[in-house]
Amino acid sequence: MKTNLKELLEFPTSFTYKVMGLAQPELVDQVVEVVQRHAPGDYSPEVKPSSKGNYHSVSITINATHIEQVETLYEELGNIEIVRMVL
């Protein structure tokens, strides 16, 4: 039996994205810019470098109001050129 995200969440809810991308200075700004378009707010993303320093992970938590918002952000964050993965 498959369970999808919509069945697991009750909205509004706090939802954290972890975005992995190339270790470039603009990564955080690009992530926040995309999030601001769909969930305006004051964000302080947490940034962690990879062990070799080639990649950064950016964790950012939003107050999600509906499943479409969550899904749209997954898609748009993944479309950032220097992003390699979104969890």
Curated annotation (Swiss-Prot):
Transmembrane segments: none annotated. GO terms for cellular component: cytosol. Pfam families: DUF493 (PF04359). InterPro entries: UPF0250_YbeD-like (IPR007454), YbeD-like_sf (IPR027471). Belongs to the UPF0250 family. This is UPF0250 protein ETA_23570.
